[in-house]
Amino acid sequence: EFELTPYLKDGENKLAVQVFKWTIGSWCEDQDFFRFSGIFRSVYLYMIPKTHLYDIKIRPQVAENLSCGTLELDLRSCGSGSVRIQLVERGRLDLAESRYETPEGTEVFALEEKMEGTLHVSREVADVKLWSAEEPYLYELRMEVYDAAGKMQEVVASKIGFRRFEMK
């Protein structure tokens, strides 16, 4: 990733990319036997607001009795403001139809926290529905980031599942 902000001017800008055939990572670029030159993978250009999340760690955990769970979040942000965190139960994913049981979802919880730097959130989820390959039950975690003036800056959504794996 590269920060381009200092090089941008108002109006139209031109982005030029120089591609080298051989790099330190040549072995990695050649592992699939692609012998092409140029850019052969996706390239993205993102505009990121001053107040935004730049690192998100999501840990859905299930209790030993498999009836309840805990959702732990570690969020790292730039700028100051607040974040609204919402967990929505989407239901079982119907793979044949590529849709959820309840497309609109059912809110499990929502909370709003002040945000500046690092934020740790831990929230219990009662009557948690477990995810498995046979029953792909998903939740949607939605994080809305607001700046200090209360204006929405970005929305980050992630599908998550609660499961427990152990060997006894």
Indicate where each model-derived feature is located.
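Accessory beta-strand-rich segments of carbohydrate-active enzymes
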Residues: E1-D55, C78-S80, S158-I160
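Beta-strand-rich ligand-recognition modules
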Residues: E1-K14, Q18-D32, E104-V108, E112-W131, ...
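Beta-strand-rich binding/interaction modules
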Residues: S67-L111, L119
